[in-house]
Amino acid sequence: MLKNDLFLRALKRQPCSRTPIWVMRQAGRYLPEYRAIREKTDFLTLCKTPELAMEVTIQPVELMGVDAAIIFSDILVVNEAMGMDVEIIETKGIKLTPPIRSQADINRLIIPEVQDKLGYVLDAIRLTKKVLDNRVPLIGFSGAAWTLFTYAVEGGGSKNYAFAKKMMYREPKMAHMLLSKISAVISEYVCAQVEAGADAIQIFDSWASALSEDDYREFALPYIKENVQAVKAKYPDVPVIVFSKDCNTILSEIADTGCDAVGLGWGIDIKKARTILGDRVCLQGNMDPTVLYGTPEKIKAEAAKVLRQFGQHTAQSGHVFNLGHGILPDVDPANLKLLVEFVKEESAKYH
């Protein structure tokens, strides 16, 4: 039995004594303890060494007091497992070779045996669950098909997604073939993470806002739905969070994927999101990450505002406090600790 199951209760919209909190990228460069480990190893080796991945996954639980851990990994492990060469230099960027731009390139990508090619993530989950010893739930995750598609076609990050969109608009069938191939791997991968012990899954569509509403409906949402339903078919009680960054105009359709929670960027008032969605899903978010550069008073004021805007809980509501995107690497860890403690204290009155 979990000693602290608030995060899972909120996702399932069950009564909670307060609002649970975790933050995206909570295991990362803002923590000196993380940097000490990173000094001795490169990023992908850290992801691929279960003992180290476990250690950095648990750091924010012990140091910051967050209500959930998220397994330390990277969304691009899926691209690598499919046969792409992935180079991640934390300060300089990402390079994937060769970029996928033709039918022959797509054919060359493999549908990997997840237990084999991504076994190190599953081992890290098993080890982390053991060491966490039921203190808090563990989140598994994957990038969404559209986001992984953009990295594959662009060969890295991009400002305007020209190659990805060129394929979408000139060769839509080819684009769907690649998206479908990536999505099949994601579905298998997230189910394997649950099997290994993950208590919840988050799908990150980091580059969602690059698409128009109609294009998002065609090239992104169907695959997210496929991934959510894959988990639900096998593990109906495992909550799934969908974080389609800044897709504030189609929140209702994101909720229609069957997910348990919708992650929000900071560009929308959480009150407005709750008005749109009612209490049919849990909401996760959505403080601007740069608020953590502020004074203690400002951090508390902004956190209080998010809690106030979400408002009073009902028997069907759920809210997980988070940032609207990942914590920034140069934030003072003391500021996150302050935020976590404040949310724990301040949120009780809304429950």
Curated annotation (Swiss-Prot):
Protein's cellular compartments: Cytoplasm
Assembly mode: Homodimer.
Family from the record: Belongs to the uroporphyrinogen decarboxylase family.
UniProt function note: Catalyzes the decarboxylation of four acetate groups of uroporphyrinogen-III to yield coproporphyrinogen-III.
Organism, as annotated: Chlorobium luteolum (strain DSM 273 / BCRC 81028 / 2530)
Signal peptide: none
EC number(s) per entry: 4.1.1.37
Entry-linked Gene3D superfamilies: 3.20.20.210
One GO MF term: uroporphyrinogen decarboxylase activity
BP GO annotations: protoporphyrinogen IX biosynthetic process
InterPro entries (UniProt xref): UROD/MetE-like_sf, Uroporphyrinogen_deCO2ase_HemE, Uroporphyrinogen_deCOase
CDD domains noted in UniProt: URO-D
Pfam families documented for this protein: URO-D
Gene that produces this protein: hemE
Keyword presence, Flavoprotein: no
Positions of the record's site feature: Transition state stabilizer: D74
Keywords, comma-separated and alphabetical: Cytoplasm, Decarboxylase, Lyase, Porphyrin biosynthesis
Keyword Nucleotide-binding: no
Catalytic activity entry: uroporphyrinogen III + 4 H(+) = coproporphyrinogen III + 4 CO2
Cellular component annotations (GO), alphabetically ordered: cytosol
Name of the protein described by the UniProt record: Uroporphyrinogen decarboxylase
Pathway participation: Porphyrin-containing compound metabolism; protoporphyrin-IX biosynthesis; coproporphyrinogen-III from 5-aminolevulinate: step 4/4
